[in-house]
Amino acid sequence: MNHTVRIRVDFSAGGSIGPGKVALLEGIHRTGSLRQAAQELRMSYRRAWLLVDEINRSFLTPATTATVGGAGGGGAALTPFGEELIRRFRRLERAIQSLSREALAPITAQVRSAPPAKARSTSSAQRRRLSRTASSGRAD
């Protein structure tokens, strides 16, 4: 049975980096555009801008640079630090996934191959009736 481990690094001084922010940085690297990266991730431009701003404020060195629009349009790019941030985060993900396979093998061996059937919920009226039946000592 397989499993996936998702990580997020929270820094003591504030800020964090996780798979969503790294995917956004990868999109910027691939497209050269914050707007296009946001569209690929089905994220609003405003949300993407706020995330990139948070990333850049979290570190001494910014992860991205932007050029102002004009006749040729604006754009966004990663700094060398932004590229390093992606590489190191993805390396950490692979290492943790590998370690978790061994550490969680006894647990994942116990996971059902299909999700369990949903338990039928008991309505409040059914619970009251069951309660009265139990307290009266008779069965329906």
Q: What residues fall within each predicted segment?
A:
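Residue cluster at the C-terminal edge of the helix-turn-helix DNA-binding motif
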Residues: R57-P62
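Central "turn" residue of the DNA-binding helix-turn-helix
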Residues: R42-S44
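Basic, amphipathic "hinge/linker" alpha-helix immediately C-terminal to the N-terminal HTH DNA-binding motif
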Residues: A66-L92
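Short, Lys/Arg-enriched N-terminal segment that forms or immediately precedes the first helix
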Residues: M1-A13
